Amino acid sequence: NNFDDVILFNTNNNIIETTNSNLFILNYNKVITPPLKDGCVDGSMRKLLISIIKNKYEFEEESISENDLDTCSEVILSNSTYGVRGIKNINKKTYNNSNLYKYLINSLNNLI
């Protein structure tokens, strides 16, 4: 099926992360990532990205539903191995990954 990763859901049907990454979505000018109480990993890259995101975007930790993936404009995955990755598509939805993704890549490169 040519999948690179799988999205994981908790028992409440909320998205928590993928098999190896934290997940962030951009919905208008607001970045959302699942809260720790939903079951995601509290990784070091997640913490760093949250601090970077707050410099430019409105930010919330809130539950993400599968429907939210249909309305957001970007989906970003992160972990300490590769940093950030922009997702091109999930099911039939295509994402542009032009704003948040580029901002995070540039911000991380400036830290190096």
Regions found by a protein language model. Name each.
Residues N1-L8:
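Short, basic/aromatic recognition patches
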Residues N12-I112:
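Conserved catalytic-core subdomain
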